[in-house]
Amino acid sequence: MSSSRSPHRSSTDSASKGALHGASHGDSPSPSKNRRRLWAGVTGLSIACVVALGWWAGTPLDNPGTATPDQQVGDGEAEDAGQSTLWQQYQRVWQANQTRPPEARKPLPLPDVSRAGYHQGEALPALELEPRDAGEASDKGSAAKGTAGESEKGALRRFDVTAYGADGSDTLSDRRAILKAHAAMRDWQRQGSDDADRPARRGVLYFPAGDYVVYGAAERDWFYSRLVALKAAVADAERQQALREALLKMQGLSLAGSHWTLMGAGSDVTHLKQTRPMLPLHASWYWSTPWLLHLGNLAEGGKQEEWQAVTPTSHRQPADTQDAITLADEADEADETDGAALAPGDEVLLESIDKRPEAVARALAPYQMEKDASTGESRWLIERDGVIKRARYRVVARDGKRLTLSLPVVHERFPGEQWRIARLHPAREVGVQGITLNGNWRGHFKHHRSAEDDSGFGLLDLDGITDGWVRDVRLDSFNQGVKVRHSSQLTLEDVTMTGKPGHIAMTISDSNQVLARQVVDQSHAWHAPGVARYATHNVYLELEHAGDSGIELHGQQSRDNVFDRKRGGHVRDRWGASVGHQPNHLRGLVLWNPVNTGKPHAAWHFMRADSHFGKVIMPTVVGATGHALGIANRHDYVRVMNAKGVTEYDPLPPMDALQARVESPGEAVKPASLYRAQRELLQETRE
């Protein structure tokens, strides 16, 4: 721990200064008293130094094979008062890397999330729409022609759902009117798509103040009656299940397309409602209920083209340091003649799957794979599936086989890894703002009791989107609030969750560079906002959730995600993930200046020895304040696992080796926000 932030610093400094001060004034004490005071001051300083050295000696470092002096907390250089040691190390390495050739760049001690958010963190667009005339909504006859309920300013046009039959003042279904308005908007966009010299037309699906029923009793009864008829008409169980899934997927509203916004008059006055729970795709798949609103590219994350091989690296390439890759010689030779070669402007997915034992061991270090004591079989699927690294980028330049990407490759690359790249077709410029989505969850939530408990009221699914946003949105009375998946470069801000406790508040899954700021979960959801499944380089900035809940860390190889200035609790069994999908999070989880508003913990376990669940690989906890958040040691976990026959650690780690990299416990550090500081550093460098 830095001595400038030590809780013992002020007392030891005052003791030594007091002794010296007393000796320099008239009315001075006797020489023997001076010696005793000086000795007390020196002794106090010595104790403080020993405590500080002991703490840092017990602080786990990165893998022995990959650590550098720049990664070690407290390397002896002078610090600014209150400045995080890790932040100072990050600054030094990051700045030095700007002048080094790519092959000589050093690993950063923290993930670089400076480019998270809409257009890499830029301000969200301001939609300037002309006010709707009072008579427009009643002009239903011309609505079918695509004029009423629309206001146009340049390439921006508003499609008012009330002009297509929606009525926010009654309790009848508005589903058909919403679909008609969306179809009219899409037709208008397509009419302007042939002009390559004009920007894409931007549509706004507009909901004036009112309550609009998207899924209610009429929809529930209709789908249920069709499901009963399906069961009676189709005897084959496999075919029956396939038809059931196709039917029930239509329960929610799937609204495709790019360059459009679903917009209300404000979250305090515009409400889209789901008054009945939807039916799950399979009775025993509790997670499978469709979402009320499904926006994006509806081809499950966006249409993906064929994979192309990437030339392997000959040396270790640290994460966040190099923005170029080279296609293999055979990668797209066939595409050169048919115009399908990757080109600037293309959205791409870059992926590696490495099943080599050394890759799995490296991903889990300093821990070992947990195995069944009786069979010796691995508990975690990472050994079977391999280490999976995947993220989304945009190609910004091409020179022969060399592609320059929109941001540095977010994963570390090692010799022997096989990388590949594919063009994607995500939805772009999709926004949701100024609305409340109301579910009708009124039960007493029990985890994994039923499909209704887990997913009966799922409100907003953002799937396969690049450069999108959500702002001024409230989610009320839900089982699942928001899910961002297969996406990149999104900003979610001013999002509030309310109502009775449900299952999951917000999930960022299989996505990168997503920024969620000023998200407030007042619903006491079982899983507070968090990450899952390959998520990387995402940021929760100033997240607030209840003290009786905990963030979601739903496993499947998430890595390098940042919770910046989070306020909320730490509760056992709230991370999520099955046994096979452990660990809950690989390396790179950062809690920066978190405030514990829940129960105090003398020794919080990031690696639980008393359960198959609850495994996080060496997170970083900096500036934790609020109620106590002590960190358990690795020694006790390893000792118990060995005793159970689950692992074979030899030797055991020392008693003071913690389950996290810890800095400044009990005192917040500077910078107050890691994300904002990284953005400032990035901007300074660009200038």
Model-derived features with residue positions:
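Extracytoplasmic beta-rich repeat domains
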Residues: 449-455
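Gly/Ser/Thr/Ala-enriched C-terminal appendages of enzymes
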Residues: 539-687
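Extracellular "leader-to-stem" segments immediately downstream of a signal peptide or signal-anchor
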Residues: 2-5, 36-42, 47-448, 622-687
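Glycine-rich beta-solenoid repeat tracts in large extracellular/virion proteins
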Residues: 251-256, 269-297, 335, 422-425, ...
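Right-handed parallel beta-helix
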Residues: 162, 259, 268, 428-439, ...
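Compositionally biased low-complexity segments, especially N-terminal hydrophobic helices
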Residues: 3-4, 29-31
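Short, intrinsically disordered terminal tails adjacent to the first/last structured region
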Residues: 1-21
